[in-house]
């Protein structure tokens, strides 16, 4: 039994089948990239994995239990960062991290922002930051979270090369410590092929 299991998922949108019979199992320490063309259902699949959406058929299990039965404990173990940063634009970068990680002290939050490339921007309201900087505020949570499972939708959008390298290193560290990372990205990952498992949605069944 894996930590996260997908069984025979079916997803239809506007009378079109995005994927059907989709099944896979993820174990501790896995790093997974969901691939496929635009419209293949990558973001839809991520939302199904978070429990934000329900499949038309099939189920997602966490540690052998259907998500709807373990929703609270599952979400305690989940960090989800979608297309939108999901941050409070009227708060500063530092205040955002305090909001999402109330048990993190200021030193930890400042270090997380520095790791994300935001040193010197800690006290600036988020609505005054660029799109890339706002994205970094959300991604700084990767250095604070205790969640086992990270689900990240295009995390490298509007991030420069150095930022992508730092984020990639953080994901590698997380999986080496037994965590799971699931992401979509159009950018090549600068890591050994052997470290990445790819699940393709180029067909109605994942390959």
From Swiss-Prot:
Q: Name one Pfam family in it.
A: ABC_tran
Q: What class of enzyme is it?
A: translocase
One MF term from GO for this chain?
ABC-type heme transporter activity
Q: Which InterPro entries does the entry link to? A: AAA+_ATPase, ABC_transporter-like_ATP-bd, ABC_transporter-like_CS, ABC_transptr_haem_export_CcmA, P-loop_NTPase
What's its catalytic activity? heme b(in) + ATP + H2O = heme b(out) + ADP + phosphate + H(+)
Under SMART domains, the record lists:
AAA
Q: Where in the cell is it found?
A: Cell inner membrane
**Where do the annotations place ATP binding?**
36-43
Q: In which broad location class does this protein mainly occur, judging by the first location in its UniProt entry? A: membrane
Q: Which GO terms describe its cellular component?
A: plasma membrane
Q: Describe the function of this protein.
A: Part of the ABC transporter complex CcmAB involved in the biogenesis of c-type cytochromes; once thought to export heme, this seems not to be the case, but its exact role is uncertain. Responsible for energy coupling to the transport system.
Protein name per the record: Cytochrome c biogenesis ATP-binding export protein CcmA
The beginning of the lineage is:
Bacteria, Pseudomonadati, Pseudomonadota, Gammaproteobacteria, Enterobacterales
Q: Which gene encodes it?
A: ccmA
